[in-house]
Amino acid sequence: RWSIALALAALLAACGTRPVAPPAPAPVVSQVSEEQAQHVTITALGLVGTPYRYGGNTPQGGFDCSGLIAWVYRTEAGLQAPRTVAALQGWGQPLPANQLRSGDLVLFGNGGPPTHAGIYVGEGRFVHAPSTGGQVRMDRLDARHWARQQVSYRRP
């Protein structure tokens, strides 16, 4: 009798279901090819050291953060990016941090609309035009100042 119960228990255990893995998130669709994204990245890195200028949108005249993004995307991908950080929040597709690739946008804020933006260049780094008196530079997303910000990511 015990052997029948044991055999039945073994049979039922063998019929158990395997845990189902959650589906992978759908890839984010982009207007920018991977090759264009690489050109965006290379061009952004090449602008490091360009002076900051409020309202600036050329390498000769300097850049503010949205001007840098607009110039790079127009030059390398033929896209017209919005010229304000608030408008960049609606440009392209949102994406989770684990899908971030070079050429994507990073937007920073403090709980309200974003107030600053840059171009992700890989390995946890981004290029941006930070402030008056400064220059276009590369920073790390995990640097103290940026890690405290609310961050979102967009793929044009």
Walk through the language-model features, giving the residues of each.
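Bacterial Sec signal peptide processing site at the extreme N-terminus
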Residues: 9-34
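Soluble non-cytosolic domains of exported or imported proteins
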Residues: 31-38, 59-64, 94, 144
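...with weaker cross-activation on analogous glycine-rich loops/strands in unrelated enzymes
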Residues: 28-29, 79-140
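Bacterial N-terminal signal peptides that target proteins for export
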Residues: 1-4
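Glycine- and charge-enriched low-complexity intrinsically disordered segments
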Residues: 145-156
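Extracytoplasmic/secreted envelope proteins and their assembly/folding machinery
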Residues: 38-41, 45, 49, 66-70, ...
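Secreted/periplasmic proteins that engage bacterial cell-wall peptidoglycan
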Residues: 53-81
